[in-house]
Regions:
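Extracytoplasmic beta-strand/coil segments of soluble accessory domains associated
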Residues: 52, 69-112
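N-terminal periplasmic accessory domains that precede
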Residues: 68-71, 90-95, 108, 129-132, ...
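Gram-negative outer-membrane beta-barrel transporters
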Residues: 341, 410-413, 424, 548-560, ...
Length: 738
């Protein structure tokens, strides 16, 4: 049945129609705008020696892309699973990624580099351009760009003036609305103001209380200023503010097949970012730029950590984080044989976090009392209170500085590139673990002793990281429509601290007080090392038939050292731990094709293949050599066909059908569980009249059943099901001032 639906929808696209307007290529962007990738690519739209996917405004609207998750599978070997809440911005590229703590892919929005991936997932209206650079970008962009960089640019008030409005409604009472005003105060000064709101009631139900999980309400605003003070100086500022409130987590027990848990779950986030970019041409040969940013993140994640109907324990993680970044960049403006770019970068991030775990009655009975009494039944214990708190407070200041440079030398048809970055980072953890409770020991039914438990432990840990991050590339451009490249780059993801293990540390210390178990050595488990990789890559960018057929192809091999992996400790523990695998090898390829067979029809397709395996990883209990790296798909696939019909007068109709494919995805290091390859079908029809658009759309039209996430808690297994069939309507209004 699914195959029939695919065939019918694909055939519908190829019906007869009038001419399609010229496809809006992704590089249709005001080149004079001050934009971070262009600054560091010596003014080019994108560097030649990189595998990159660029999505413009029109393609983003066709695919209804509003956030990073919309790029998943559209970009080859780029996967962002949609699970949990918006704090879980896990991104996997070419077999590598990160589920918690440090990001593996960098993100900049209007030149603001985000320091915490917990803030990555938010809706972005008025997108002009989305760039995904795959492979390490650490030489120019530094820490946490080991797998790549995402750069998003929104509309400038100097390039467009008017009012833009959008309203959307879909399945599960999902809605999205935004309105933007763009105005020129003068020919050189422009302002824009954007307000947006979105929400959903969620697609799944908690059978314990009959309530929907995944309910969301989000409100945001953006104010952007663009000032061209002179022909040599430009100043841009982008301010963004967002407030998010989400409920629940649709995690389904593998044993029962049900979403059923008793405690409250929610995620709340307040986010502010501001970025000021100044660019000055100090001569006809040299340009200098300054990119300054501030970001504030206040959030609270509270969840039923056991995700069962019983009252085991709950976890809260509440952060108060702020950060500053400063990037000074100088680059050559001449078009001679030698071009160069160099700079100094610094950042400071301060995080105050509270992460208490609260034990409930069932948790006390099962995890503590039963465990203790089994070892000494003659003297059983009973906890004095049926609820108590394991408190963990952290202060984590982190700062870093870096100096970097890169030069390109053109010799005939060849361009030789060499770059180097020296990156230093210092991170400190100050922790305070506390617990104030007690228990009573009985013997022959009588009180034998009362034992108070008063834990008050403070400590301080410091980690220094110093890295040299080189890059070497050679590009061959025998013609304007062909360029081939080979590159060798080093990627880097910063190390950090295992804050989520401190609840286990306290739990084990409690057991140790009662004479059972062994206490953790905090010094040994508190930190994890940086992740480093050597990336070997070859690729080509090919334009054929007067740019009616555009192809990008790349092959890569990655030698990753100390890969950071999230592990679930054995036993009835409450936390997760980040550990370093010894060595991982990943190789594969990517193919992107875009073409216009006729002026009516636009076809796009991407495919990514990754073979990522542990080359050396032994966790002390098992040897995982040769096993696939979990959570990263081995294949991504995207196919799209867009057909346009010019109707009478100012009316037009665009028909779009697309499909995505993902998998195989292994769920654990031993590769005993996996999600098979799956595909989803989407389609839209957009009716346009002058400044007005009406779009009908649907996703997962074949109602494909698949899982997006797997984890264990207290030896219990859980999965999250992917979103079911969804459909909706979107209205856009773009009124441009004359």
């Amino acid at each position: 049945m699914k195959r029939i639906v695919y065939i019918l929808l694909l055939c519908a696209v190829f019906t007869s129609a009038k001419a399609l307007p010229e496809a809006e290529h992704a590089d249709t962007v005001l080149m004079q705008e001050v934009e971070v990738v262009a600054i560091k690519a010596n003014g080019a739209t994108l560097p030649d020696a990189v595998a990159a996917t660029v999505i413009g405004r029109k393609e983003a609207e066709q695919l209804n892309i509003q956030a990073l998750k919309g790029l998943s599978d559209v970009v080859p070997n780029f996967f962002v699973p949609d699970y949990g809440s918006r704090i879980t911005s896990s991104i996997y590229v070419r077999g590598l990624g990160a589920r918690m703590d440090q990001a593996a892919v960098g993100l900049t929005v209007d030149n603001v580099p985000f320091l915490n991936k917990d803030a990555y997932d938010f809706d972005i209206p008025d997108i002009v351009r989305m760039e995904m650079l795959r492979g390490p970008q650490s030489t120019l962009f530094g820490r946490n760009t080991l797998c790549g960089l995402i750069n998003i640019t929104t509309l400038s008030p100097l390039s467009w003036q008017g009012v833009r409005a959008q309203g959307e409604y879909g399945s599960a009472n999902t809605y999205r609305a935004s309105v933007s005003a763009y105005r020129k105060h003068s020919e050189r000064l422009g302002f824009s103001l954007t307000a947006q709101a979105s929400g959903t009631d969620g697609f799944f139900t908690n059978t314990y209380n009959g309530k929907k999980t995944g309910r969301e309400r989000q409100y945001a605003g953006r104010f952007k200023t663009d000032w061209v003070a002179s022909s040599n100086f430009r100043l841009t500022n982008a301010f963004f503010i967002s407030n998010l409130n989400q409920s629940g987590y649709p995690y389904r027990s593998v044993a029962s097949g049900q979403i059923a848990y008793n405690d409250t779950c929610f995620y709340r986030r307040f986010l502010i970012t501001d970025g000021l970019t100044a660019a000055l041409n100090i001569s006809d040969k040299v340009s200098v730029s300054s990119i300054t940013s501030f970001q504030l993140l206040h959030d609270n994640m509270t969840l039923d950590q056991d995700f069962l109907p019983q009252d085991f324990f709950t976890l809260t993680q509440r952060k108060r984080e702020y950060g500053f970044t400063q990037d000074f960049v100088a680059r050559s403006l001449n078009s001679g044989a030698l071009t160069w770019v160099g700079g100094l970068f610094g950042f400071y991030k301060h995080n105050d976090m509270l992460a208490p775990v609260t034990f409930g009655d069932t948790g006390i009975t099962t995890l503590i009392e039963d465990h203790r009494n089994a070892s000494n039944p003659a003297y059983p214990i009973r906890w004095d209170e049926r609820s108590f708190r394991l408190g963990s407070d952290f202060t984590i200041p982190t700062y870093g500085v870096a100096a970097y440079g890169q030069a390109d030398y053109q010799l005939g048809e060849f361009t030789f590139t060499a770059g180097l970055r020296l990156d230093y980072e210092l991170s400190t953890l100050r922790y305070h673990s506390q617990c104030n409770t007690g228990y009573t020991i009985y013997h022959d039914g009588e009180v034998f002793a009362r034992v108070p438990v008063d834990i008050n432990q403070r400590g301080r840990e410091t980690r220094h990281f110093l890295e040299l991050l080189p890059k070497i590339a050679v590009t061959w451009r025998p013609a304007t429509d062909l360029s081939c490249y080979v590159s060798w780059t080093k990627g880097y993801k910063a190390g950090g601290f295992n804050t989520q293990m401190f609840s286990d540390v306290l739990q084990q210390r409690l057991m140790n007080i009662m004479g059972i178990g062994n206490a953790y050595d905090v010094d040994k488990i508190v930190g994890y090392k940086p992740e480093k990789s050597w990336n070997y890559e070859a690729g080509a960018h090919i334009d054929l038939l007067d740019r009616r057929l555009r192809t990008d192809v790349s092959l890569f091999f990655i030698d990753c050292r100390d890969q950071q992996l999230t592990m679930f400790p054995d036993g009835t523990t409450t936390g997760r731990i980040m550990t370093n695998a010894g060595r991982t090898h990943s190789f594969g390829g990517e193919l992107s094709v875009e073409g216009n067979p006729t002026r009516n029809l636009l076809l796009r397709g991407t495919w990514g293949y990754t073979h990522a395996r542990f080359h050396r990883f032994n966790n002390g209990q098992a040897d995982f050599r040769g096993k696939a790296v979990p959570y990263a798909p081995s294949n991504t696939l995207f196919l799209q066909a867009v057909y346009a019909i010019d109707l009478r007068g100012d009316w037009s109709l665009d028909l779009d059908v697309h499909t995505t494919g993902t998998g195989k995805i292994y769920w654990n290091e031993s590769n005993t569980l996996h999600q098979p390859f799956y595909m989803q079908l989407g389609a839209s029809a957009t009716l346009s009249y002058k400044d007005l658009q009406l779009q009908l759309w649907g996703e997962n039209l074949t109602q494909t059943h698949f899982d997006t996430f797997y984890f264990m808690s207290m030896k219990n297994e859980f999965l999250q099901r992917g979103k079911p069939l969804r459909c909706g309507v979107t209205i856009r209004y773009n009124f441009q001032f004359s």
